[in-house]
Structures are given as C-alpha cells and as structure tokens.
Design a protein with these regions (language model features):
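Phosphodiester-processing cores and adjacent nucleic acid-binding clamps
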Residues: 1-281
Length: 281
C-alpha cells in the first residue's frame, strides 16, 4: 500500500500501551472501556496455555528424534549415520580405507580429539608403526559407535587433565572437546536431510546441495550432496584404488582445483577408465 501515491496519511500501527488503548476507547463509558482493554484481554490470556515449542537446550542444537520406518520406534541416529558413511566410503575407496579418508571422516564425525586421544595411548610407538596402529584404532573406535568414542575421549581427558575432574566437570569438558556431526549432536539433522534428499531422488528430482553441506565429506557419503569436497583425485569403481598424487609425488590438487579437470587415466589394475572426483572444499 505504501507504493500507492494516493495514500496521504498512514494510521498509527504500533503496539499500544494500556493507557493508549484506554484513550482510544475513550468514546465509550469509562468502566466499559476498562473491561474491554484490561479485564477481557486478561481473561483471554488466562485461557491460553504456555507451551515450549522448542525445548531450551542451553545453547546447544536441538536434536529431534527420528522415527524408524515402522513409525513406532526411534532410530539410533549416531549408529545409522556411522553405518551409512562407512558403507559408502568402503564402496568408493575400499577396505581398509586410505589414511586420509579415515582421518577426514573421524574429524567430520567427532573432531580432531579422537585421533589425538588414540595417539596419546600409543605414545610408545613411532613412525610407520604409530601411523598404522593409530588409524586402525581410529576406525575401530568410531565404527563401534558413539559410546565407544565418548569413552575413548573421556579417558584421555581424565588422564591429561591438570586438575582432578569430578563426573560433572568431566562431562562438561567432554561436551566442549567433541565436535563434528555426531560429537556436536547434528546427526539427526543430517539423517533427516538424507531422507529428504533420498525421497526426492527416488521421485526423479535431483537435489543440488551447496554451502556448508557441499563441503562436508560426511554429507557426500550419506548421499545428501553429490559434491565430493576432497582434493582432486582418481578412483577406480572396480578395485577401489584411489590416487591423490601424480607420478612425482605431488598432490593432484596443487595443479587441479577440480577433479573433473583431471586428464583421462586408466586404472593400472583393472585397465578401465578411472573416475575423476574431488572439488577441494
């Protein structure tokens, strides 16, 4: 309406105080005006129940519960997310997973502290032995589930703390130390997104996810986005070989910002064209 030039005066539309409302009803009897403005409005207020639409979670994300297909029980979201991610990762990159993939998944699911805590437990090892055992343990701890990860980090925090931690202090420190999709409580949100995208894809509609989701390798492995945020690389759909470096040992991502721009290459094992992937996000 403000775009219409014939409007010359605009009525006051602000929320009025009680006194202003009584003044606006001054053409009525004083007692009747008071009843309309004060008494009746309070009667309506008393008839309205207070409900908490979104529970107060103290500043942390509100994580809804996700029902299973039978509509009766609820999904164990951390378990489902972990299974989806590692099933797809193994299908693309093989089993065991390359160290770089294992580390990326661990960081995106729970933060850096999981691998840090494992290396602390293996401080007597060094070199290649430390590397092999660290990533083996990282995989085992995460695949065993959320409780396994929490116990691992909880133990590390307790052993490395400079002060004595009671149970409450330890849990607060654990909560502050963990990050990532599951560690920060975003797993139900990701699972809901995965279901929405899958339903859309099943109906024949492509969903193009970008932004923060497009840069999440976990989201890629869950099928939420078609964007692979890893650096440019080749991967074989048959033997699961992945190549992130050229013949001289230089990262392919240093030359190619997008894996789609990589030159065609044949798998040395299967002699079929390698898939070109990775958008370095």
């Amino acid at each position: 309406p403000l775009a219409k030039k014939d409007i010359t005066s605009i009525p006051s539309q602000h929320f009025r105080t009680t006194e202003e409302m009584l003044n606006d009803f001054s053409f009525l009897d004083k007692d009747l005006a008071y009843k309309i403005v004060v008494e009746n409005t309070n009667k309506v207020l008393d008839m309205v129940d207070e409900i908490e639409v979104i529970p107060d979670t103290g500043g942390t994300p509100f994580s809804p519960r996700v029902k299973s297909d039978d509509e009766k029980s609820y999904l164990d979201c951390p378990r489902v997310v972990t299974d989806l991610v590692y099933t797809k990762a193994k299908d693309w990159y093989g089993d065991p997973l390359p160290y770089s993939i294992e580390e990326r998944l661990g960081t995106e699911l729970y933060g850096d502290i999981v691998l840090t805590s494992i290396k602390y437990d293996l401080k007597d090892l060094e070199g290649e032995e430390l590397k092999v055992e660290s990533f083996k343990r990282l995989h085992e701890v995460i695949v065993n589930g959320r409780d396994s990860v929490f116990n691992q980090v909880r133990k590390y925090l307790k052993e490395t703390s400079e002060e004595e931690l009671d149970d409450d202090s330890l849990e607060k420190k654990l909560k502050a130390s963990l990050g990532g999709v599951i560690g920060a409580g975003f797993d139900p949100i990701y699972l809901i997104a995965q279901r929405l995208v899958k339903h859309s894809n099943d109906e024949g509609y492509l969903v193009g996810s970008r932004g923060s989701v497009g840069s999440s390798f976990v989201a890629t492995m869950m099928g939420i986005t078609e964007v692979n945020p890893l650096s440019a690389h080749y991967r074989c759909s048959k033997c699961k070989l992945s190549i992130f470096e050229d013949e001289d040992g230089n990262p392919l991502g240093a030359t190619y910002s997008s894996g789609f721009d990589l030159p065609d290459k044949e798998c040395p094992n299967c002699h079929i064209p390698l898939l070109k992937d990775g958008q370095d996000m």
